[in-house]
């Protein structure tokens, strides 16, 4: 059975109630590829608003940009899995490079958050990727494997069915630089091989591996043709009308 194409829009720390409502209403009214799963991730303040607008047409799901690994307590500024459940938010992004680099989140901490989310019934867009220095040192596969291994220590084999892996080379995020189709496919194929060896052949066959890093309406169609590219995690372009073209990359 073919893997369902997946496109996520990470709004990051952008948007207002008005602009986020407009973006989702535009998606509600647009002609979208019905075979593509679409998820948008607004800032936490607007999650319930986004959910209400998305519920009007049920074409788009909503994701948090982050979640904490503890169930509740004195963790100022954090969001718990149970709070996402209560707000009926089905997805969360975990491990984005901006949190790894700026907020110093470790592989182990990120893995605990992935486990907490999945244990609580929240599906995860699990971000991994290397820096420019690591790529130039030919350590890309070593780095992403280390990030994956941390999660593998926390999850059961069955729980990988709730994970979408987002390969996002750090050097391509927000820079305008994009991994070539060959570079993206090489890493995606290595991740799929890791899934087969470390988790199970079923996980390798069924887990969606998406690409992120300056994805635009100009490069999405070529990337979407690659065998192991199952979709995209889109940053800045998800705030623009061109997001529809990226969702429809396989039409």
From Swiss-Prot:
Transmembrane segments: none
Keywords tagged on the record: Gluconeogenesis, Glycolysis, Isomerase
Catalysed reactions listed for this entry: D-glyceraldehyde 3-phosphate = dihydroxyacetone phosphate
Record: residues binding substrate: 10, 12
InterPro entries: Aldolase_TIM, TIM_sf, TrioseP_Isoase_bac/euk, Triosephosphate_isomerase, Triosephosphate_isomerase_AS
Protein family according to the UniProt entry: Belongs to the triosephosphate isomerase family.
HAMAP family found in the cross-reference section: TIM_B
EC number, UniProt record: 5.3.1.1
Catalytic residues in the record: 96, 168
Subunit text: Homodimer.
Matching Gene3D superfamilies: Aldolase class I
Origin superkingdom: Eukaryota
This protein's name: Triosephosphate isomerase
Recorded metabolic or biological pathway in which this protein acts: Carbohydrate biosynthesis; gluconeogenesis; Carbohydrate degradation; glycolysis; D-glyceraldehyde 3-phosphate from glycerone phosphate: step 1/1
Residues annotated as signal peptide: none
One function term, GO molecular function aspect: triose-phosphate isomerase activity
GO cellular component, one term: cytosol
Coiled-coil region list: none
């Amino acid at each position: 059975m073919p893997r369902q194409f997946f496109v996520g829009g990470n709004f990051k720390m952008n948007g207002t109630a008005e602009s986020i409502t407009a973006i989702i209403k535009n998606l509600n009214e647009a002609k979208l590829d019905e075979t593509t799963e679409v998820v948008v991730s607004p800032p936490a303040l607007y999650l319930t608003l986004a959910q209400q607008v998305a519920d009007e047409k049920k074409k788009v799901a909503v994701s948090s940009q982050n979640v904490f690994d503890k169930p509740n307590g004195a963790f100022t500024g954090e969001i718990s899995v149970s709070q996402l459940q209560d707000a009926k938010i089905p997805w969360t992004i975990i491990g984005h490079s901006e949190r790894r680099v700026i907020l110093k989140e470790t592989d182990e901490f990120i893995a605990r958050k992935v486990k907490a989310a999945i244990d609580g019934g929240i599906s995860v867009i699990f971000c991994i990727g290397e820096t420019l220095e690591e790529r130039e040192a030919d350590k890309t596969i070593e780095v992403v494997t280390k990030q994956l291994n941390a999660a593998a220590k926390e999850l059961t084999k069955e729980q990988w069915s709730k994970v979408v892996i987002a390969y996002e080379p750090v050097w391509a995020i927000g820079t305008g630089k994009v991994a070539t189709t060959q570079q993206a496919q090489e890493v995606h194929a290595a991740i799929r091989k890791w899934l087969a060896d470390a988790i199970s052949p079923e996980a390798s066959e069924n887990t969606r591996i998406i690409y992120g890093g300056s994805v635009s309406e100009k490069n999405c169609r070529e990337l979407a043709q690659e065998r192991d590219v199952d979709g995209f995690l889109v940053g800045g372009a998800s705030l623009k009308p061109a997001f529809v073209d990226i969702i429809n990359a396989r039409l």
